[in-house]
Amino acid sequence: MSTPLLPSSDDFLLVILSSPSGAGKTTLTKRLLEEFPDLRFSVSHTTRSPRPGEVDGKDYHFVARDGFEERVRNERFLEWAEVHGNLYGTSLGEIERAKADPQCRGMIFDIDYQGARQIRAKLPGITGIFILPPTMPELLRRLRGRASETEEVVQRRYSVAQREIEHYAFFDYLVINDDLSVAFDRMKGILLAERCKRTRLASVAESLLRDAPAT
């Protein structure tokens, strides 16, 4: 069975946000959603355990591994991948509901390179933003700042982070998160520029020409 075609809309903005662990993606994503209330966050399904403060259905849909695998068999994911021993996936229903909402003009996906590659294969017009740490030592320091994780887990995440950064050229934009406010302003600028692209607003220009009164 092939993936169902999703409703199309020239001005509906689809954005991938990706980064290695510790680059500040989660914080930046929350700020962007506050700045752009007409964007929706794609809530992924995952088999990992919730972290302190995370809410089921808001941060992730937390599911058992067998339930996740059943959804895979039923082709209910636009993308899915295994990261750090846990499964993550983007449900087709997330995008379908967002596009059916007249108040929604776009969706943000918080996914890694594996998932981004799968989504872009099905949605080639999607915009990809990759967030970089200022230096690798700073990234390691941030990872070690997570008191809930052991040094073994930190080293594994650091190794995966290096492999993630190797795929930087896949993305359309790179944002260095040395200063959170500066990084946010740059990402905000990217979204504003994307909304003004000719391909998104061509229908507006064409309607002006079509409706122009004769002189």
Please place each PLM-identified region on the residue numbering:
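Post-Walker A helix-loop "phosphate-sensing" segment adjacent to the P-loop in P-loop NTPases
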Residues: E34-S42
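Conserved phosphate-donor/acceptor-positioning beta-strand/loop module used by diverse small-molecule
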Residues: G106-D112, A121-G145, I176-N177
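Post-Walker A alpha-helix
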Residues: L28-T29
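P-loop (Walker A) phosphate-binding loop of NTP-binding proteins
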Residues: S18-P20
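Conserved lysine of the Walker
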Residues: K25
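ATP-dependent small-molecule kinase phosphotransfer cores
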Residues: T46-M107, Y113-R117
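NTP-dependent small-molecule kinase module
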Residues: S2-P4, S148, E166-T215
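Extreme N-terminal, non-catalytic leader segments
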Residues: M1-V15
